[in-house]
Structure formats: C-alpha cells, structure tokens
C-alpha cells in the first residue's frame, strides 16, 4: 500500500535568514512563522463545497496580515482495495467572484491509490480581518465511486505554513520583509500547481456549483417573502469553462506517520 509523508517542513516552503529567525520581533515585521493545526473534512457527497480552516491554531495579529506560504493536503480513501473511480480536490478562495480566479489549485487521484498527498504554494497575503472570516473552501468532486448514501468514502486533512506580519512595509529603519526566494526549494510546486490548473476543469465545476446553490437560495428567499418576482431566464448563457491541466498522484513515495502539527514559531 502506498503511504505518504506525515510531517510538514517549513523549509520546504520558505527560506528564512538567520537574522529573520532570531532577531526580536521589534526589529522585523515578521512576527512568526507557523504551522497550523490539522483541519479535517469528511466527504459524504459526490460533490460538495466545504469551508476549511487553513489557519487553525495560528495566532493572528490585530490589524496585521497573514501570508499563506504553503499548504499540504493529505487524503485517505475509506474503501476496500482496488475500487474504481477517483476524486478531484480544489482549493477555493471564496472572496473571488470569478470561478477561474477563485480556483487556487486542483488535484486528481484515483480511488485505487488508498492514500495521497499534494502540496500547494498559494504565496499571497490577506488581512487579519479577512482571515477571521474563513475565506477558504474546498470543492470535492468524486466520480464513479459506488457507495451507498450516508457513508464517508474519503477523508481529507489540511495543514498550512504561514507567516504573520504586523505590516507589509518592505523597507524601514530596522525592518526588511521576508519573501519566498525565486530559487527556493518549492519553486517546482508552483509549476506543479500550474499543471493542475491547466488540465482539471475545477473552475468550471466551481462556477456550476455556485450557480446551482445560488438558485436554490434564491428560490427559498422568494417563497419565504411571498413576492411575485420574475423567474430567471432559462436560456441564460452558461459560463464557458477554462482548460486546466491535471497532475497525477506522483508525489508519494514515503510511509505515512500519524502527525498533528502544533503551532511552531521562530
């Protein structure tokens, strides 16, 4: 059975100089580099859009920023060996209204691959205020897995590496902001994510899922209000899909270890 790596290494996502690691916080806008605690999603439906807390256990700074440097997603099929079918997993920033821009990364793997893992490098900042609103979601699309309703065929776990900032001033009297170096060890991951994006049409699925759930909500609101509002045009054009690529499950070589990441800081 193919098992996966169970420990998150900060150095796989970011390079910190010795000064950035050991200087007191008053000398740098980087207050801490942290590994979040594990957040888990149990998948019960063929298609679902669920909120995920990528900053679980991370202490945020009031009025500051958080940089999502990296993300490790681990999944396990709760099925017998050699089952058919597979799953597409898509990380979503729900703030973005265009589906293709909301789709941060997508990944596909077969159910026969009992356990899998992939890494993502989002590499962008959000404000503490936005982070407190739980802005990330996971779109899961299970295909051709025949299991009775009400059971859980798949479990997903998420751990992130993030940097907490007091401010984003790049140069100051005694400050220099840290960044992911161009030659960092995870440059390849950004290329891999691009391959996911070009082969897996998860942005199309996200647009359809949002449209479907939006119509259900709109219908309920109209029934509750009792207003005779005009029905939406059934001939309304559907959003065109974007081509995206898939990266097969080829990141996995090691044996899995049970691991819960506690917050870690410099």
From Swiss-Prot:
Keywords: Cleavage on pair of basic residues, DNA-binding, Host cell junction, Host cytoplasm, Host cytoskeleton, Host-virus interaction, RNA-binding, Transport, Viral movement protein. Residues 211-244 are annotated as: Disordered. It is found in: Host cytoplasm, Host cytoskeleton; Host cell junction, Host plasmodesma. GO terms for cellular component: host cell cytoplasm; host cell plasmodesma; host cytoskeleton. It holds the Pfam family MP. One of its GO terms (molecular function) is DNA binding. Its main location: host cell. The keyword RNA-binding applies. GO terms for biological process: transport of virus in host, cell to cell. Residues 230-244 have a biased composition (Basic and acidic residues). Disulfide bonds: none annotated. Belongs to the tobamovirus movement protein family. The ToBRFV MVP has gained resistance to antiviral Tm-2(2) defense, thereby allowing it to spread from Jordan to most of the world tomato's cultures and pose a major threat to agriculture. Transports viral genome to neighboring plant cells directly through plasmosdesmata, without any budding. The movement protein allows efficient cell to cell propagation, by bypassing the host cell wall barrier. Forms a ribonucleoprotein complex with viral RNA. Binds microtubules and modulates microtubule stability. Can bind double-stranded DNA. Evades host resistance (R) protein (e.g. tomato ToMV resistance protein TM-2(2), AC Q71BG9) in ToMV/TMV resistant plants. Binds to host RBCS at the plasmodesmata; this interaction seems required for viral systemic movement. This is Movement protein. It comes from Tomato brown rugose fruit virus (isolate TOBRFV/Tomato/Jordan/Tom1-Jo/2015).
């Amino acid at each position: 059975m193919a098992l996966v790596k169970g420990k998150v290494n900060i150095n796989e996502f970011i390079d910190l100089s010795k000064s950035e690691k050991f200087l007191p916080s008053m000398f740098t806008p980087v207050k801490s580099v942290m590994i979040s605690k594990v957040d888990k999603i149990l998948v019960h439906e063929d298609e679902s859009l669920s909120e995920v807390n990528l900053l679980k256990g991370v202490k945020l700074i009031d009025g500051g920023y958080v940089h999502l440097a990296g993300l490790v997603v681990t999944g396990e099929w709760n099925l017998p060996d050699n089952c058919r079918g597979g799953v597409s997993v898509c990380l979503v920033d729900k703030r973005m209204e265009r589906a293709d821009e909301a789709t941060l990364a997508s990944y596909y793997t077969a159910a026969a691959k009992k356990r899998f893992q992939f890494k993502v490098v989002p590499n962008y900042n959000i404000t503490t205020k936005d982070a407190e609103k739980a802005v990330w979601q996971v779109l899961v699309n299970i295909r051709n897995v025949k299991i009775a309703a009400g059971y859980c065929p798949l479990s997903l776990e998420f751990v992130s590496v993030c940097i907490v900032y007091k401010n984003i001033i790049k140069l100051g009297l005694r400050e220099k902001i840290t960044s992911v170096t161009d030659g960092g060890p995870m440059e390849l991951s950004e290329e891999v994510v691009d391959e996911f994006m070009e082969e897996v049409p998860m942005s199309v699925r996200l647009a359809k899922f949002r449209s479907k759930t939006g119509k259900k909500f709109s219908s309920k609101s109209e029934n509750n209000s009792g207003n005779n509002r005009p029905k939406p045009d059934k001939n309304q054009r559907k959003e065109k899909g974007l081509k995206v690529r898939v990266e097969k499950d080829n990141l996995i070589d090691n044996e899995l270890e049970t691991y819960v990441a506690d917050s870690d800081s410099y």
